[in-house]
Swiss-Prot record:
Binds 1 iron-sulfur cluster per subunit. This is Iron-sulfur cluster insertion protein ErpA. Required for insertion of 4Fe-4S clusters for at least IspG. Keywords: Iron, Iron-sulfur, Metal-binding. Homodimer. Iron-sulfur cluster binds at C39, C103, C105. The keyword Metal-binding applies.
């Protein structure tokens, strides 16, 4: 898998560092995945992992690693993972060039 196929922005990496610090575990990695559901057919999910799975692709920004499983990878190739703060709250977002439609909340999409 191409290591440049997904990008984690500096803002997202900074937030991951803050969350790792608050958990007291510098080995945590951000896992990004796609599941069926949501109002547009697919939903994005985020959680932390202590170690990669055998089929994970790893993407790096400085000392921050992002993991994507092989099934989710096909839906996320070319995407940018960012972190935004605004009036609507703070959250990780994905700018996905493969999505043909995106839900207003930004966490659901279709291809």
């Amino acid at each position: 898998m191409n290591a440049q196929a997904l990008v984690i922005t500096d803002n997202a990496a900074k937030k991951v560092r803050q969350l790792r610090d608050s958990e007291g575990n510098q080995d945590l990695m951000l896992r990004v995945y796609v599941t069926g559901g949501g109002c547009s057919g697919f939903s994005y999910g985020f959680n932390f992992a202590d170690s990669p799975n055998e089929d994970d692709a790893e993407f790096v920004n400085g000392d921050v690693k992002m993991l994507v499983d092989s099934l989710s990878y096909q839906y996320l190739v070319g995407s940018v993972v960012d972190y935004i703060e605004g009036l609507e709250g703070s959250r990780f977002i994905i700018q996905n060039p493969n999505a043909t439609t995106t839900c207003g909340c930004g966490s659901s999409f279709s291809i």
